């Protein structure tokens, strides 16, 4: 009898220990590691390809690179490193997942599946503020994380505000403090923000500063053009009728040259394919400015328009004079140039492009979807 009791007691102790270990492992937890001085600064640059890495970096103030994984965001520096470096700061949460990451100035704002918004100083790794918002979808960044840091779902920035959409409404939070500025009962799934300070939803636009509806705005739904990462700061749009508009000011300006479905806007000019060339024209009058080699417009860097040609040559042009100010092939250590561009980011100093295989499967999680293990190529501008 004594042995039976002893065995039962031992079994209870083992079970209790297992429960304790399981609770300690699986309980909700957060881990924050901050930067040890000296804090990162923006390095000097000269135009060339710097390296290739397996993850999509979000360049923050051209000082650090931020990466997203399922349950963690982390940063490395300097931003022109040819490989992913040891993290200078990191923030991990369990069991929540990273839904999206954006940056405004030096502040990195992450949105998590439980609805938490967490703002971290990009150069120190310290939490600046946090706010509770509506729950969000889980991690959808696949292998590189590009969808999470360059195209997050329902997370946008505009000036001093970060905007969150969920449950048929949109809310604006102050980037510096996390204070909720306003909430509008406007369905805005995957809307976009304009360079002129509006957030554009399928049914119309609201002012980022106040949350009030914009009285005079073309009818939607809309197609954004000339946007930065996170579908933010868009320089133009096409309305439901396919008419083009410039959106860099307080009021949209009609731009007939932007009516073409293959046209975009950069540095105040409209660009579209013309035969074997890329043509720039005045957005309002349509007067031709310059022709360039056939290329895709990636964005604007310190006033220069950045292009990627079909043979994967990177160009930066002065849109006013038409002069090419830099040119080099987007290859590292003799890699082939047989890849398709996926997503990308252009800043004043850097460009990063996700490279996809030419004959790839539809599923990003299927082997052979990306061009190589180090799918993202980096360059200085």
Regions found by a protein language model. Name each.
Residues 2-381:
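Secretory-pathway ectodomains
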């Amino acid at each position: 009898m004594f042995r039976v009791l002893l065995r039962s007691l031992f079994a209870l102790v083992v079970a209790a220990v297992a429960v304790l270990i399981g609770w300690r492992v699986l309980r909700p937890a957060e881990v924050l590691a901050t930067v040890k001085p000296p804090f990162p600064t923006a390095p000097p640059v000269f135009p060339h390809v710097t390296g290739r890495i397996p993850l999509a970096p979000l360049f923050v103030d051209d000082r650090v690179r931020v990466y997203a994984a399922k349950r963690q965001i982390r940063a490395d520096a300097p931003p022109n490193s040819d490989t992913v470096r040891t993290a200078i700061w990191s923030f991990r949460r369990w069991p929540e997942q990273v839904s999206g990451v954006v940056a405004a100035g030096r502040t990195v704002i992450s949105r998590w599946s439980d609805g938490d918004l967490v703002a971290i100083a990009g150069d120190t790794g310290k939490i600046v503020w946090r706010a509770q918002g509506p729950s969000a979808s889980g991690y959808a960044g696949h292998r590189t994380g590009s969808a999470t840091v360059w195209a997050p779902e329902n997370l946008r920035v505009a000036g001093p505000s970060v905007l969150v959409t969920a449950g048929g409404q949109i809310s604006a939070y102050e980037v510096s403090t996390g204070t909720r500025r306003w909430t509008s009962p406007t369905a805005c799934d995957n809307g976009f923000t304009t360079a002129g300070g509006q957030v554009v939803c399928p049914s119309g636009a609201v002012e980022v500063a106040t949350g009030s509806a914009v009285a005079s705005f073309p009818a939607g739904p809309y197609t954004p053009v000339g946007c930065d990462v996170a579908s933010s700061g868009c320089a133009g749009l096409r309305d439901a009728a396919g008419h083009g508009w410039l959106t860099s000011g307080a009021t949209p300006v009609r731009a007939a040259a932007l009516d073409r479905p293959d046209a975009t806007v950069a540095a105040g000019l409209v660009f579209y394919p013309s035969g074997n060339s890329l043509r720039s024209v005045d957005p309002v009058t349509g007067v031709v400015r310059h022709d360039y080699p056939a290329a895709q417009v990636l964005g604007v860097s310190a006033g220069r328009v950045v292009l990627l040609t079909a043979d994967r040559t990177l160009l930066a042009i002065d849109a006013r004079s038409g002069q090419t100010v830099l040119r080099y092939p987007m290859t590292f250590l003799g890699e082939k140039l047989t890849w398709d561009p996926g997503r990308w980011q252009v800043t004043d100093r850097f460009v990063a492009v996700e490279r996809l295989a030419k004959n790839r499967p539809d599923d990003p999680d299927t082997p052979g979807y990306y061009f190589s293990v180090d799918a993202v190529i980096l360059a200085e501008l």
